[in-house]
Amino acid sequence: RQQACLEERRELEQLSDLAEIEKQLDKASGELKSLGLSLRAKRHQTADRFSANVNTLLPALGMPKAKLSLEFEAIEAHAHGIDRVNFLWQAHAGAQARLLAKTASGGELSRIALAISTASAQSNPTPTLIFDEADAGVGGAVGQAIGELMRDLGQTRQVLCVTHLPQVASQAHQQFKVLKREQDGLTYSDVQTLDTQDRIEEIARMLGGKEISTTTRLAAKEMLKLKG
């Protein structure tokens, strides 16, 4: 009889523990929901301002009619809140806004990333930004704007950029040249740091091709003088 009483007591204690656990779980769920709603409100407060700041930069980057917007999709609570934040991209006037990741080209993505990084420069702690041919498919004037934005970002963080445009390369604080060579049947890539004279030669080559003339050298010197 005593053993039966002890077992019954243990069962009651387990039920009591379960009730306490459920109580704590309900409390935690309530706190999670409250925090999620607070985060949602803050995101909605900043979304329009953020997208507007990004959109003001797009014309200079060769996308005059494009628009970036944010959409919030309610989902089950997770580490980043109770919403999924979707970036929507409208490439030109009259186009339907679609998911950025599935719509924008590689070159557009790099330029959009540059616009986002510039718009959020004060609040973004990322120490290193990498842009792979953000100038793909654009001309000199847009390339100049891209280079100037990257140079501005480079004042507060490290910015690495792969580029084929002299207007972008001339804006860099430091320039490197990547060379490929073959040795013993294998291909190697070498990275060469360029000094001032090397930069003049390389930018002149980017301007004029294989044959570098006095005119292209003078143009390269002028571009380096005019950087930020």
For the regions a protein language model found, what residue spans apply to each?
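Walker B catalytic acidic pair
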Residues: 132-133
